[in-house]
A protein has these predicted regions:
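Flexible hinge/capping segments at coil-to-helix
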Residues: 1-25
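Alpha-helix/helix-capping structural signal
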Residues: 8-9, 30-33, 59, 77-78
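Secondary-structure junction motif
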Residues: 24-44
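C-terminal effector-binding regulatory domain of bacterial HTH transcription factors
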Residues: 80, 85, 93-144
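Short secondary-structure boundary/capping segments
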Residues: 17-18, 44-45, 99-102
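Hydrophobic hinge/microswitch elements
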Residues: 46-96
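Generic beta-sheet signal
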Residues: 5-7, 28, 73, 91
């Protein structure tokens, strides 16, 4: 799950989901459809043109959000630290995206040749991933 995050200075200027369209939207290059899906979910009228900035990885995107380059989609686990410290804020609330459809939420895949499942460590990881209930929400601690 993701949380829409930005610096407090940017957050002061975001009063509604529509205000997101006034800022660069930060994401990873592999999740190009994520912002359009989120804006649609939030019923935001999307202007012509792409206001997103893509980064190679989530850590770089998070650093850009921390530097005030735009509004980022930060994983719940990473966002907790930044929200708690006050480095980032969640201008639309921490749970603005919790009711997104499961097929709109980014996932991950374990791709491994079948023969590699004979390796104990790979088999253990595969088994563990398969047994998890990935539908359950990650809960983050309340702010102090």
């Amino acid at each position: 799950p993701k949380i829409i995050c930005c610096t407090p200075a940017i957050g002061e200027r975001i009063r509604s989901a529509q205000d997101l369209t006034h800022f660069p939207l930060l994401d990873t290059v592999k999740s190009k459809r994520l912002w359009p899906d989120i804006l649609r979910h939030l019923t935001v009228e999307q202007a012509e043109g792409d206001r997103s900035i893509g980064f190679d990885d989530a850590a770089s995107m998070r650093r850009a959000a921390l530097q005030g380059i735009g509004v980022g989609l930060v994983s719940v686990i990473d966002a907790e630290e930044d929200l708690r410290s006050g480095a980032l804020v969640a201008p639309l609330g921490r749970d603005a995206l919790v009711d997104m459809k499961p097929d709109e939420v980014p996932g991950f895949y374990l791709v491994v040749p079948r023969g590699h499942l004979r390796v104990k460590a790979v088999a253990a990881l595969h088994r563990w991933l398969s047994q998890q209930d990935w539908r359950s929400d990650l809960r983050i601690s309340p702010l102090p």
